[in-house]
């Protein structure tokens, strides 16, 4: 297929289509995705535990800061998705090699972005919101655009920041859904633990989770959901970029999937 012959209209993919496409991607190569998912989830829980037990922050502050800090563990997830789109035989070693090679610029950009974002939001200035919206694209930009910090920053300005207004609605919808599901999961778990199991198992009161376990349950719920939201957001970003260049993400995926099925035949 010649990209110039497609003449694809440049518009964002609806959230439902992005979720369905992400689910099909995961079904083709579940191993690398599950590994990246576990890395993201365990890293997020570790950060929350550090804030709660080492820095002794109130759980409300922890739940507010974790969404800002957790995406530092997202690079393996976006790397897996990027490799799967362009190379259907993505393996653990490929994802690990790319993550290590591009980890340094990602970390430097992540720290700088979060510091500036917090300063901007603390001062209630527009650049804080601007950087927060642009930071959604940090993982995909570093994953796809190069390993050097200079190249990532230069191309990130061209692709990511230029597109953030176009697909900001997807990020907002995903964030609201994530918050809703987290609250629903937390409320249900709190009811079951406190009202049902607490009446049956007297040893439950002696568990260390009893002290602040509500925060831990919320944290785990977020840590389990965040990788999938990141994955869907990556496909939204990638869809916009591919359409900008005349391609369509669905066509590219079907082509790669067909090649992979032929290879297994």
Please annotate each region the language model reported.
Residues 1-265:
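Hydrophobic alpha-helical membrane segments
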């Amino acid at each position: 297929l010649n990209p110039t012959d497609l003449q694809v209209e440049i518009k964002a993919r609806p959230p439902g289509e992005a979720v369905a496409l992400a689910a099909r991607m995961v079904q083709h190569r579940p191993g690398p995705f599950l590994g990246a998912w576990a890395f993201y989830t365990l890293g997020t829980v570790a950060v929350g535990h550090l804030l709660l037990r080492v820095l002794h922050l109130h759980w409300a502050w922890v739940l507010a800061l974790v969404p800002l800090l957790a995406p530092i563990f997202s690079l393996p997830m976006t790397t897996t998705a990027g490799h799967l789109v362009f190379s259907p035989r993505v393996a653990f070693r490929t994802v690990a090699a790319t993550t290590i090679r591009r980890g340094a610029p990602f970390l430097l950009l992540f720290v700088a972005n979060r510091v500036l974002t917090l300063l901007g939001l603390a001062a209630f200035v527009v650049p804080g919101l601007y950087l927060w919206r642009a930071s959604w694209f940090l993982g995909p930009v570093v994953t796809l655009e190069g390993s050097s910090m200079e190249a990532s920053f230069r191309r990130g300005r061209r692709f990511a920041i230029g597109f953030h207004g176009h697909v900001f609605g997807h990020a907002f919808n995903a964030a609201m859904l994530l918050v809703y599901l987290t609250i629903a999961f937390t409320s249900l778990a709190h009811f079951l633990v406190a009202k049902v199991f607490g009446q049956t198992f007297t040893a439950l009161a002696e568990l260390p989770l009893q002290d602040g376990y509500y925060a831990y349950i919320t944290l785990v719920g977020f840590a389990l959901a965040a990788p999938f939201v990141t994955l869907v957001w990556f496909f939204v970003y990638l869809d916009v970029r591919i359409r900008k260049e005349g391609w369509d993400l669905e066509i590219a995926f079907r082509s790669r999937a067909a090649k992979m099925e032929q290879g297994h035949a």
